[in-house]
Amino acid sequence: MNVTASRRTSFAGWAGDHALALDTLDSRLAVDDLEPLRDIVGGARVVALGESSHHIREFYQVRHRILRFLVERCGFEVYALEAPFTQGQVLDGWVRAGPGTVEQVAADGIALSLGRCREMHETLTWMRERNLTAAAPPLRCLGTDLPGAAGSPLPALEEVAGYVRRAAPEALAALEQAVSVARRFHDPVTITALGRYQSLGPGEQDLLTSALSLLMGHLQRLALVQRARGHGAEHDTAMWHLRGAWYLDQLHRANAQEGFESASTFRDVYMAESVLRLLEGGTRVVLAAHNWHIQRTPAADSQGNPLLPAGAHLAAALGDDYRAIGVTSSLGRTTTLGEPTPERPQGAWYDAPLPPPAEGSIEAAFPTDRLWTLADLRAARPHIDDAASFQHSRMADYFLDIPVFEAFDAIAHVSRTTGTDHVLTRAEG
């Protein structure tokens, strides 16, 4: 008889006895309680922090405390967000003593109003204050996602216009063609921009694709020259804006043929590549994105076709240098995204009941008699006999099919959650 196997227990039993029980989410308190996190992280170059729902107060707080630990104790230098790379530049400027208020830069730099809450403001403010007082290299805060809330390439095209005029005026015609088409369907609301693109004629759609390809090819050909002139960083940034615009064009085309579920994974390719390009020189990165985006494993759409999240790309590129920490909860409230309103043009986030943990969900295994719990799934696996049974995890107000022990290296479980101060309560009746 295998003695080791006979001594195995359930994950619920292991979590109750061995997972790290934590009793504070206060971002101001010392992070000594998170010292066991060091074993989860190891020498990883990228640590991803998830969330099962957006606009959850406690999830922002969990991320803030873990970010502090990774920065203060492990030397991480970049906080990369599920936010547009192009518009997110204002965040990086602000945390390094740039102008403006935290409320304004968070609203401008983070799509879908995910920056419009006190908890995100507190994280950005902590980063700025640390940069003003610490002798260490400055913390950076960068977006990783497609431009225009993954709806319009216009912000990226406008961002590179000045560089194109200076470095490659002969490419202005291609830029102007792309801008002229982008303006025809531009809208800050993602779903509106997606619909307007579909109303373009095939000739206009082809013109946009052609112009973007010509522009990218022409600028890429100048890379060596621009670097020799000392403009390498500016050139690389301009190319990254354009790459986001190009991927977004591909998303629009795929949306018409495959549907948005599949097309949206162009976001994930770009998010993963945006993180990987930050790793030069040994930089370590914390990525904050939804649990779906950070999972290590491929997913599938409703027809069974493969979907590749950003985490799958990062795991393939980095192997053991990538860690995915899912963040979820068992009790309390969650949020759902409703239709845009004049006051909430990017969509209104509404409070919603949190269904009880489903059978076979990872949430069902966690104790709820503490504020939150951090469980190292990799450490647990040799000691449990039911890892393969956990095939579900929360996504907003429902449960997603996901092989939890393959998808995540650790789980941060908050016992009870609430919406942020930006979340609305639906009117009765």
What residue ranges belong to the model's regions?
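Structured catalytic-domain cores with a bias toward divalent-metal coordination
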Residues: 1-429
